[in-house]
């Protein structure tokens, strides 16, 4: 580049920086956090072009190498990336709610271990009621678009969120979608993991539903400070089916994970995350453009047809009933019905 070109670039650089700063500021201004807003600011939101994001994050054991809030950290990142994508659309705003740290069914329930350090789950009926209550509040205030971001994979958990969303649709005519319960985004993540591994690694990872190479890689990418270095020596707990995972999780000293975390890497996590996040955002934007999410396959529905999953889910619901009975008995004894 000649001296004249250098002078032109030098002169334009501050202008370009200013323009980029303005665009970034405008985008950030379109992402609102309800906890920071007053009554008039919330009332002024255009209901037809405001998307409410409800991030969640079950506190769930993830074995000896990952934090109990692993799902929550992923949901926080997904929420931010989705918000950024939505406000790129002219006229659209995002209203972000504080993360709700509640969920149904830790992976420990796969082995019928309903008490497990690190898991602090709520009952199916509780989670459904929480999100139905929020659906009522949002629907009564005229909001039309609500996305729930709650990556946890337990079928009962996803059914609770799906049912709350269906209630919102049927009662208020809007859209409240359990985005992470739709299969297209989940399948993209699983496919990416398979493509990243050698045949030998795929055999070692097996059918892994929790805290495996896949999830450990994602946490190494997102929150490496919270991943214990000992994952590199983690012995595999490999299954080929959900029935295998039940048998593994029932063993006395099961550590809380499946598959082979030792295969994980931050580089793999970056690839997995980017592919999954891109597909997740793509599906959300398609829904805003008119795609009927109720015609898409849902994790909670598909797993009903798998006998091993049904066994786990039914046992979990029976445990829920037992817990509810204990609580109700105490309330009756205190005259608090």
Model-predicted segments: where are they?
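N-terminal secretory signal peptides that target proteins for export/translocation
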Residues: 1-9
């Amino acid at each position: 580049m000649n001296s004249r070109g250098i002078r032109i670039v030098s002169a334009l650089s501050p202008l370009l920086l200013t323009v980029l700063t303005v665009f970034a500021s405008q985008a950030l201004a379109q992402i609102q956090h309800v906890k920071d807003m007053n009554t008039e600011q919330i009332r002024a939101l255009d209901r037809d072009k405001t998307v409410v994001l409800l991030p969640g994050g079950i506190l769930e054991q993830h074995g000896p190498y990952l934090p109990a809030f692993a799902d929550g950290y992923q949901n926080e990142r997904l929420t931010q990336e989705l918000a950024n994508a939505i406000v790129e659309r002219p006229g659209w705003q995002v209203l972000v709610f504080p993360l709700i740290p509640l969920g149904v069914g830790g992976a420990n329930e796969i082995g019928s271990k309903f008490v497990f350090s690190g898991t602090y789950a709520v009952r199916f009926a509780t989670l459904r009621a929480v999100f139905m209550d929020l659906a009522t509040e949002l629907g009564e205030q005229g909001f039309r678009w609500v996305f729930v971001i709650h990556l946890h994979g337990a079928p009962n958990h996803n059914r609770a969120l799906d049912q709350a969303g269906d209630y919102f649709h049927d009662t208020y005519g809007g859209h409240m979608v359990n985005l992470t319960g739709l299969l297209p985004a989940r399948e993209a993540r699983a496919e990416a993991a398979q493509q990243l591994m050698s045949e030998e690694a795929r055999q070692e990872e097996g059918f892994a539903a929790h805290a495996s190479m896949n999830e450990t890689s994602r946490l190494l990418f997102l929150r490496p400070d919270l991943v214990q270095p000992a994952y590199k020596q983690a012995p595999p707990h490999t299954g080929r089916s959900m029935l295998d995972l039940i048998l593994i999780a029932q063993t006395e000293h099961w550590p809380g994970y499946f598959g082979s975390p030792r295969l994980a890497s931050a580089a793999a996590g970056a690839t997995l995350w980017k592919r999954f996040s891109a597909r997740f955002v793509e599906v959300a934007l398609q829904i805003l453009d008119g795609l009927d999410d109720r015609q898409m396959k849902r994790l909670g529905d598909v797993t009903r047809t798998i006998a091993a999953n049904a066994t786990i889910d039914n046992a979990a619901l029976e445990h829920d009933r037992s817990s509810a009975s204990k609580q109700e008995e105490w309330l009756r004894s205190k005259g608090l019905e």
